[in-house]
Structures are given as structure tokens and as C-alpha cells.
Design a protein with these regions (language model features):
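Transmembrane helical core of 7TM receptor-like proteins
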Residues: 1-337
Length: 337
């Protein structure tokens, strides 16, 4: 007699909405159902909100693409923006486009289809790309803080230190470090065994929901993941905090209030972006597992994958006279042509 949920020919059981593989050990107690496909179910419990959320996230994604691409083009076209800070900002804008594009299009498809099935390989690729681009984002924000430190605390040496070769080396180092960290964490995460339920109540394949599906011995992989994660978020935060500590000390020592206000204004945009980005990452990844709700995690994930990449061009342009002036001249040229 055939068992419900099994294919009589292949004897492959069905778990959730995906095929799984049954591995038979020496004894019956060692039987495991290993997940070979994941099913994303974020927001599916509210089907009436699917269309409004789809339109909202689509609008946010388009603004993200236009805003960050516009920032890259503006920096490329205006020679006054060919300085280290804007060189780093152009790479940050590019990373924001990539970072958002890894998750948001799939989230849009998930809302339309009331869920999304991902193969094991697709899930691993998405996790790798998200980790890669996110790590580079962290490193670039740290480099921008270091750039501000040099500009404020070492103004006479700034031009000598931040040469074109130095800028390229720093950015290349950020890309290489992000690649290495992403590779190690992805390999560590996907050498875990995932068994039982295959539903991920999240908007993409991220580490916290994946670890909930892990079974068997996972201590070694989790230690490796945590160790390499320390070299991304906490390490970047240390560079940022130390840089701004020196900046604050330098500002306090300035003789006039006008000088202090002018100098601090050059850092406000970056401080705002750092606070938003790292604030959401800390809430998501560096807090304990107790008391976490999937609804809160989904909202926070939308913030750092969709909202913050959309806001960054606004943050760096609204309080920045050089960017606003470059944008005004660009628009005037467009009108005249």
C-alpha cells in the first residue's frame, strides 16, 4: 500500500511544497528527510496586502535604481566630484543597486505568486551574493569614515595619503575581503544539513532562517560563520567609531563655532547613512534569538534591502552643497539641450 505524500516509483516523500530526499541509515531512528528546495512564505499570511505591497516595493526599487544610477552618473560627469569621498560614494551607490537587486525582484515575484520556490543551488547563490554585496557595503562605509578622519584630522596630508592609487587599493581590498568572507560563510552555511520543514518565513535566503532549518552537528560551521561575520559588521563599526571619535575631538578643539559647525556638516550625511544601515544590521544579526518574531524580522529586512538603498542618494545629496550644485548644473544642461 502506497504511503500518502510519496511517489510510488521513486519513493521520494514530499515536504511542504518541495521534493526531499530520504536517507536511510543503519537503523530506522537514523532516517532523515533532507531539504533540496526551499519555499519562501514571507507576507503570504496577508494575501489582501499582496498587490499594495507589490506596488510599494516596485516603486521603492525603481527609485533605488534611478537614484543610485543617477548618483554614479553625476559623480562621473562632474569633475568637481572627482575626489576620494565621491569616488567611494559612487562605489557605495553601485553596491546599493546590486544589494537591492539580489532580493527585491524575487520579493516582488513572491508577492505575485503568494510564495516562491528556490532550489538549493539558487538559495546558496542568493545567500552568497547578498553576503558579498552587503559585506562590501560595510567596508565602504568604514572607508568613508576613514576618509572623513583624514580630511578633518590630517588636512595637510590628506591629498598625499588619499592618492588615486590609494583609493583604488582600498576599494579593491574591500571587494576582495567581501568576496572571501562571502565564500567562507556560504560554504559553511550550505555544508549544514537541512531537514524537516522547508518553509522559510522570510523574504530571501538569509542566515537566521536557514539556521532554524539546520539539523545534526552544526557547531563548527556556526563558529566559522560567526568568526567571519565579526570581520564584517563589528570590524567596520570599530573603524567608524574610532574615526569619528578622533573627528569629534578635532571639532571640539576648533576655536570658532562656525568652524565646528561647518566641519561637522561634512560628516552628517555619512553619519545618517551609517546609523540607518548598521542599526538595522545590529537589530537583525547581533541580537539574541529569544523573542524574535518573523514579522519584525521581515520588516527590518525590508528596511536594509529596500528602504536604505533607496534613501542613500537622498541622504548624500540633500545635505551636500557640492552634489546639489552638480545636479543643478546637470539639469540646466539637459534643459538647454
Amino acid at each position: 500500500m502506497e504511503k500518502k505524500g510519496q511517489n510510488p516509483d521513486t519513493d521520494i516523500p514530499m515536504v511542504g511544497k518541495s521534493p526531499c530526499v530520504r536517507i536511510t541509515g543503519i537503523t530506522a531512528e537514523m532516517n532523515l528527510t533532507l531539504v533540496t528546495e526551499f519555499f519562501l512564505i514571507a507576507f503570504t499570511e496577508y494575501p489582501e496586502w499582496a498587490l499594495p505591497l507589490f506596488l510599494l516595493f516596485l516603486f521603492m526599487y525603481l527609485i533605488t535604481l534611478l537614484g543610485n544610477l543617477g548618483m554614479i552618473i553625476l559623480i562621473r560627469l562632474d569633475h568637481r566630484l572627482h575626489i576620494p569621498m565621491y569616488f567611494l560614494l559612487s562605489h557605495l551607490s553601485f553596491m546599493d543597486i546590486c544589494y537591492s537587486s539580489v532580493t527585491v525582484p524575487q520579493m516582488l515575484a513572491m508577492l505575485l505568486e503568494h510564495g516562491a520556490a528556490l532550489s538549493y543551488t539558487r538559495c546558496a547563490i542568493q545567500f552568497f551574493l547578498f553576503t558579498f554585496f552587503g559585506s562590501i557595503d560595510c567596508y565602504l562605509l568604514a572607508l568613508m569614515a576613514y576618509d572623513r578622519y583624514l580630511a578633518v584630522c590630517q588636512p595637510l596630508l590628506y591629498v598625499t595619503i588619499m592618492t588615486q592609487q590609494t583609493r583604488l587599493s582600498l576599494v579593491t581590498g574591500a571587494y576582495v575581503a567581501g568576496l572571501f568572507s562571502a565564500l567562507v560563510r556560504t560554504v559553511s552555511a550550505f555544508t549544514l544539513s537541512f531537514c524537516g520543514a522547508n518553509e522559510i518565513d522570510f523574504i530571501f535566503c538569509d542566515l537566521p532562517p536557514l539556521l532554524k532549518l539546520a539539523c545534526g552537528e552544526s557547531y563548527t560551521q556556526e563558529v566559522v560563520i560567526v568568526v567571519f561575520a565579526i570581520f564584517v559588521i563589528p570590524a567596520s563599526m570599530v573603524v567608524i567609531l574610532v574615526s569619528y571619535l578622533f573627528i569629534i575631538v578635532a571639532i571640539v578643539r576648533m576655536p570658532s563655532a562656525g568652524s565646528r559647525a561647518k566641519t561637522f556638516s561634512t560628516c552628517t550625511s555619512h553619519l545618517t547613512a551609517v546609523s540607518l544601515f548598521f542599526g538595522t544590521l545590529i537589530f537583525m544579526y547581533l541580537r539574541g534569538n529569544s523573542g524574535q518574531s518573523s514579522e519584525k524580522n521581515q520588516v527590518v529586512s525590508v528596511l536594509y534591502t529596500g528602504v536604505i538603498p533607496m534613501l542613500n542618494p537622498l541622504i548624500y545629496s540633500l545635505r551636500n552643497k557640492e552634489v546639489k550644485e552638480a545636479l543643478r548644473k546637470f539639469l540646466n544642461r539637459v534643459k538647454l539641450s
